[in-house]
Amino acid sequence: MKDVILIANAGSSSLKISIFEIQNKQVKDKIYNIFLEKNDNKILCYINKKQESATDIKDDAIEMMIDLFEDWWKKQENLNLIATGHRIVHGGKNFNKPVIVNEKVSEDLRVLIPLNPLHQPYNLQVLDLFLQKYKEIVHIACFDTSFHFTNPPITKAFGLPKKYYAKGIIRYGFHGLSYKYVSSHFKEMTKEDLPIKTIIAHLGSGSSLCAIKNGLSLTSSMGFSVLDGVMMGTRTGNIDPGIVLYLIDHEKMTTKEITELLYKKSGLLGISGESSDIRTLLASNSPDAKFAIDLFVYRIVLEIGKLTAALEGIDGLIFTAGVGQNSAVIREMISAKLSWLGIKIDDTKNQKNEHLISTESSKVKVFAVPTNEELIIAEEVIKFL
C-alpha cells in the first residue's frame, strides 16, 4: 500500500486535487490529478485529464464535488492517506507559515473571508469538509500571503490614518506559493543561481509580480486584495479609488454590483468584450482584443519599472504561470518594452519556451519556467509528518 498526501485547491466553481506518493518523508510522484468543475447544471469530473463523469447538480456544488471524490477514493484500496494540504489564499497578519488546522485555526481563518471573498470561502469550505471526514489525519493550511511576511513596513502601508494599519488594512501580497516554488526550485530547473535582484512575473488568469532580493520577497504588485496590481483576465487591477466612489454616488451601484464588476467583468474580458483568455484574444482580429492585450502588456511593463525601483536594480526577470511560461508572444511584447533595462530576448529560445530566453549580451537574464503550487504545498506538508 502506498502512503499518499492529498493537496486541495478550491475555487468558487472548481476543485483541484493532487495526490502525491510519499516515501521516506519525501515527495516521490504525483500519481493522480483530479479536477472537478461546475459546468452549467452539471459537475464534471476529470481524473488525469480524462473525463470520468458528469453529474447533475442537486445540492451545494462544493459538497457534491467532495462526495464525488469520496466515491472515487473508496475504490482506491492500495492508497493510504496520511495527510492533506490546502491552499488558503489569505493568512492575514498572523499566519506567516503553514499550520496544522484545528478548530481555533479554522475560526481565525473564517474571520478573514471579507479580505478575500473571491477565494477564501471556498478554500475553507473544502478544508472543513476534509476535517470532518478524515479526523484521524493531519490537515495543513498553506498560505499565499506567508511568502510576503518579509516585506518591510514601508512597502505595506497605505496613505491612510495609522489606526487602519493596526486594523490590518495593509498590503499583503498574493501568489506566494507560486513565488516560493519558483525561487526555491529555480536552480534545479535552470542550473543557475537565483539572481540577487529578481522580479518574478506570475501571469495567468490572475496575475501579479514580485520583487525578490536574496531569495526573499521585498514587495509585490498585489496589495490588500487580489484586485490590485496589473490588469488580469476578469479583474481590473489597480484603479483610482475615486472610480468606486463615483460608481456608488452617480451610477447608484451597490457594493455587490461593484464587486461583480471589479472581480468578474473587467480586465481582458471587459476591455475586449470577447474573452478573458489571452490565447483567444491573440487569435482575434478585433481592435478591442488588440487593445486589451496592449493594455495588459503596458500595465505589466509599468509594474516591472516600479519593482525595479524598489530593488534599486534588476539582475533577473522570470516569467511563470500559464501565460508567463507558455506565451512566447506576450513575453516578447513585454521584453521589447524593457530594452531600456538592457533586456534582449533570443527569439529562437523564446519560441521554444526554453528556460533561459535572453541573449548572452542581455544585461538582465530572462527566464521562462513552470510553477507548481501543489508540489510546494506537498513539500510543506511532509515537514509535519
Swiss-Prot record:
ATP binds at K16, H202, L203, G204, S205, G206, D277, I278, R279. This is Acetate kinase. Mg(2+). Can also accept Mn(2+). PROSITE patterns: ACETATE_KINASE_1, ACETATE_KINASE_2. One of its GO terms (biological process) is acetyl-CoA biosynthetic process. It catalyses: acetate + ATP = acetyl phosphate + ADP. It holds the Pfam family Acetate_kinase. PANTHER family: ACETATE KINASE, ACETATE KINASE-RELATED. The active site is at D144. HAMAP family: Acetate_kinase (MF_00020). Homodimer. It comes from Rickettsia akari (strain Hartford). Substrate binds at R87. The record marks H175, R235 as: Transition state stabilizer. GO terms for molecular function: acetate kinase activity; ATP binding; magnesium ion binding. Mg(2+) binds at N9, E373. Catalyzes the formation of acetyl phosphate from acetate and ATP. Can also catalyze the reverse reaction. It is found in: Cytoplasm.
